[in-house]
Regions:
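Membrane-lumen/periplasm interface segments of specific transmembrane helices
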Residues: 2-18, 34, 200-269
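Short hydrophobic/aromatic helix or loop-helix immediately within or flanking a transmembrane segment
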Residues: 33-55, 59-85
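Transmembrane-helix motifs of polytopic, lipid-linked glycan transferases
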Residues: 78-82, 91-119, 124
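Specific aromatic-rich, kink-prone transmembrane helix
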Residues: 106, 144-147, 162-181, 203, ...
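Membrane-interface transmembrane helices that cradle and orient dolichyl/undecaprenyl
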Residues: 120-121, 125-133, 170-181, 211-213
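Short helix- or helix-capping micro-motifs
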Residues: 137-148, 186-190
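Transmembrane helices and adjacent periplasmic/lumenal helix-loop junctions
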Residues: 150, 184-208
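Short acidic/glycine- and proline-prone juxtamembrane loop motifs at membrane-interface regions
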Residues: 155-162
């Protein structure tokens, strides 16, 4: 998939080079072509950090600026660049490729777990010997994702590969009931792309589904208690899970709050 996407970008670059109305300036090579648009802002965050003095429109509203982008991609890629003494554009592509390969492995495990859950009622991410059909189906699902229409972004300097990897790891934590481990993973996800609110909503809906299932199970196993008592017991048993969902939602406000405190404007983000 990476080779195919690189070929597509190379062809697109050649087409753009011959267009009389397009001038890439210093970004006229493949490395520069893969680090355009949003990737330029991530590089600017690495080199200049975020602006304290915001650009304003004629009506006084905040204009488009680097605060629209989360810092995690720039921080990790910048750390790689500083550690190995390489150019930032190379480091961010290396990070994206590594995150994409890791994402493929995590997705494979998630697909295996979902198939085991469907057939056995247990979310087990291990691929068992003799389950070639499940393994094959999971690999085909990963391939479909790797060759999807949006997948070329996974070899650019964008943060999508890193963000989706962290989302997939968050899903794994939720399905395995690792809610303490979920918190740092979800925080990193919220600092990679603005996914804190939908991720928190997912954790909240999962909490609701688990709580309702616990309540139904209690009513089936022992109907001697009142419905209210069983509902309270189910809620109390899943309270930590609910707290995790609320904390994950709160992570969505970390970057906007940082922007507001740093610039003195509540609408900086």
């Amino acid at each position: 998939a990476c080779i195919l996407h690189l070929g597509m970008f190379s062809i697109a670059l050649e087409q753009h080079r011959t267009h009389p109305l397009i001038d890439f300036g210093q970004h006229n090579d493949l490395l520069g072509f893969l680090n355009r648009w949003d990737a330029l802002f991530y590089e600017r965050i690495y080199t200049e950090w975020y602006p304290q003095n915001l650009p304003l429109r004629a009506d006084g509203s905040v204009d488009y600026n680097a605060w629209a982008f989360m810092p995690l991609q720039s921080l990790i890629a910048g750390g790689i660049a500083n550690t190995f003494g390489i150019e930032y554009r190379v480091a961010t592509l290396a990070l994206t490729l590594a995150a994409g390969f890791a994402l493929a492995y995590v997705l494979y495990r998630l697909f295996i777990g979902c198939l085991n859950w469907r057939d056995r009622g247990v979310f087990d991410t291990r691929a068992f010997v003799g389950d070639e059909s499940r393994n094959r189906l999971a690999l085909w699902a990963v391939a479909a994702y790797a060759f999807s229409m949006a997948s070329p972004v996974f070899i650019t300097g964008y943060a999508e590969a890193l963000s989706i990897l962290l989302i997939a790891l968050s899903v794994w934590c939720v399905l395995r009931g690792r809610y303490v481990l979920l918190l740092p993973v979800a925080l990193l996800a919220a600092l990679s792309r603005p996914v804190g609110v939908p991720l928190g909503a997912f954790v909240g809906l999962w909490w609701l589904w688990c709580t309702v299932n616990d309540y139904r199970r209690r009513r089936i196993e022992d109907a001697s208690h009142s419905a209210l008592s069983d509902a309270w017991a189910a809620f109390r048993g899943r309270f930590g899970q609910l707290l995790s969902a609320l904390l994950v939602c709160s992570f969505a406000f970390v970057h906007p709050l940082h922007a507001a405190l740093y610039t003195g404007r509540i609408d900086a983000y």
